[in-house]
From Swiss-Prot:
Family per record: Belongs to the chaperonin (HSP60) family.
Protein known as: Chaperonin GroEL
Domain of life of the source: Bacteria
The organism's taxonomic lineage, starting at the top: Bacteria, Pseudomonadati, Bacteroidota, Cytophagia, Cytophagales
One example of a Gene Ontology biological process annotation: protein refolding
Gene behind this protein: groEL
Pfam families per UniProt: Cpn60_TCP1
GO cellular component: cytoplasm
Catalytic activity field: ATP + H2O + a folded polypeptide = ADP + phosphate + an unfolded polypeptide
Native organism: Amoebophilus asiaticus (strain 5a2)
Described purpose of this protein according to its UniProt entry: Together with its co-chaperonin GroES, plays an essential role in assisting protein folding. The GroEL-GroES system forms a nano-cage that allows encapsulation of the non-native substrate proteins and provides a physical environment optimized to promote and accelerate protein folding.
Length: 544
């Protein structure tokens, strides 16, 4: 396919047009009084959103060069969403501001490479100051405030996320699912739950709930398939003398072994239940080891030299309560040693830090949560599918922002934190005038998010920015109430990580756009009339 090649100011002007189109569509959503965007879907109902990244993902421009500019801004939003889960609109506004100011200076003769170096130096200083101004999250109230703001000032969602985090701890897994009705609620699963149910309904002890309930039970953990009863006999005889129930977790239990267990359960000779091991391959081995550590048992594995027929009660784990239904097994209050569990948690944490795969990271975090206190499920209810999708997006945003706040602390919200970093730009050493111009570009751009928040709230940006620059500390403009106040005390706070990533990603892409001298894109395809269209017209005329 033929390529369209443009250079210099023409290339940058086209890119700017794409950047502006994308940014202008996204930035209407910024702030507590930001507006909604309605997105037409090819199939199904249109979606209504106030989530920056959802808007950005839908935009594709007709002109190929303008589209390149738009897609690069989409990259800013995506990177920020991936890293912090929120701050996509702030990042977009910052990128547009840095690029727009930079392109004017390049047109006036500034060296793009020196401008970029100036911008990079400024961002480094601003990020450092941001970290200094950051405060650690100290209580549940602050978690609720962060979540409320990220959920577009929905205090119900904020409270729900704070409650969930209280119950499962900062390392606990919180998942978001659609509720069957219109009610939104939190359900907490304490202990370790995995998605494997009983191998036979004959193991059920509570016929009303169709669950197997075992109290003060032993747990046998084996990584191989058990089909011959002879292997199980010694350990079953030892357990029957204690009178305590037994849960068997193995790769599979079938044939003679399963039949014998069922018969013994029905006769009342043995309180027993059996489930398959969770996961597959290496992940299964790791999860069995987690269960063993949590319950104080040992994985009976021939790879390690342990044989099932030689197993004694010392090999078994214990738990205060075990609930098994058709699909899930829940182990509560395992008998493992605290120091062993903590060592395993530390090991999983270091694996999370070292992995580059998002999928692996998610699975490791699930394992971490199961070891460290449980899983909270947020069931999101809504009257319509459109409302459900919009609400779910907001809950996801709030959840990510809350985690970011726990990691790196919080700063004053409402665009004020960025303005408070401006003094950090005063004493940066530069090599030439163009680098100083790059620093000034960042100085101006740090005001852009606040201007946009005020503009969306129907105010005059320049006046309010000036008033806030003259003040100090956390004093700022609360766009929701229209008052000037201490934003930290008013609960208008942002996660430091969100603000930092928005800055870094915006500056990175905007600087690259500034230093672009040539753009190569596919030629724009002309709209061609459909084949046979003229003939159709003639035929239809004859029919009339």
């Amino acid at each position: 396919m033929a390529k369209h090649i443009i250079f210099d100011s023409e290339a940058r002007a086209k890119l700017k047009s794409g950047v502006d189109t994308m940014a202008n569509a996204v930035k209407v959503t910024l702030g507590p009084k930001g507006r909604n965007v309605v997105i037409d879907k090819k199939y199904g109902a249109p979606s209504i959103t106030k989530d920056g990244i959802s808007v950005a993902k839908e935009i594709e421009l007709k002109d190929p060069v303008e589209n390149l500019g738009a897609q690069l801004i989409k990259e800013v939003a995506s990177k920020t969403a991936d890293g912090a889960g929120d701050g996509t609109t702030t990042a977009t506004v910052l990128a547009q501001s840095i690029f727009s100011a930079g392109i004017k200076n390049v047109a006036a003769g500034a060296n793009p490479m020196d401008l970029k170096r100036g911008v990079d130096k400024a961002i480094e200083a601003v990020v450092e100051r941001l970290k200094q101004n950051s405060r650690k999250i100290s209580n549940s109230k602050e978690i609720e405030q962060v979540a409320t703001i990220s959920a577009n000032n929905d205090s119900k969602i904020g409270k729900m996320i704070a409650d969930a985090m209280d119950k499962v701890g900062k390392d606990g897994v919180i998942t978001v699912e659609e509720a069957k009705g219109t009610e939104t609620e939190v359900k907490v699963v304490e202990g370790m739950e995995f998605d494997r149910g009983y191998l036979s309904p004959y193991f059920v002890t509570n016929t009303e709930k169709m669950e197997a309930e075992l109290g003060n039970a032993y747990i046998l953990i084996c990584d191989k398939k058990i089909s011959v009863m002879k292997e199980l006999l010694p350990i079953l005889e030892a357990i029957s003398q204690t009178g305590r129930p037994l849960l068997i977790i193995a790769e599979d239990i079938e044939g003679e072994a399963l039949a014998t267990l069922v018969v013994n359960k029905i006769r009342g000779a043995l309180k027993v239940a059996a489930v398959k091991a969770p996961g597959f391959g290496d992940r299964r081995k790791a999860m069995l080891e987690d269960i063993a550590i949590l319950t104080g048992g040992t994985v009976i594995s021939e790879e390690r030299g342990y044989k099932l027929e030689n197993a004694t009660l010392d090999y078994l784990g214990t738990a205060e309560k075990i609930n098994i239904d058709k699909e899930n097994t829940l182990i509560v209050n395992g008998g493992g040693k605290k120091e062993d569990i903590q060592a395993r948690i530390s090991q999983i944490r270091s694996q999370i830090e070292n992995t580059t795969s998002d999928y692996d990271k998610e699975k490791l975090q699930e394992r971490l949560a199961k070891l460290s206190g449980g899983v909270a499920i947020l069931y999101i209810g809504a009257a319509t599918e459109v409302e459900m999708k919009e609400k779910k997006d907001r809950v996801d945003d709030a959840l990510h922002a809350t985690r970011a706040a726990v990691q790196e602390g919080v700063v004053a919200g409402g665009g004020v934190a960025l303005i408070r970093t401006i003094p950090a730009l005063e004493n940066i050493e530069v090599e030439n005038e163009d680098q100083a111009t790059g620093i000034n570009i960042v100085r101006t751009s740090l005001e852009a998010p606040l201007r946009t928040i005020v503009s969306n709230a129907g105010g005059e940006g320049a006046v309010i920015v000036q008033k806030i620059r003259e003040a100090q500390g956390d004093f700022g403009y609360n766009a929701r109430t229209g008052n000037f106040e201490n934003l930290y005390e008013a609960g208008v706070i942002d996660p430091t990580k969100v603000t930092r990533l928005a800055l870094e990603n915006a500056a990175s892409i905007a600087s690259l756009l500034l230093t672009t001298e040539c753009v190569i894109a596919d030629e724009k395809e002309e709209d061609k009339p459909g084949v046979g269209a003229p003939g159709m017209g003639g035929g239809m005329g004859g029919m009339m």
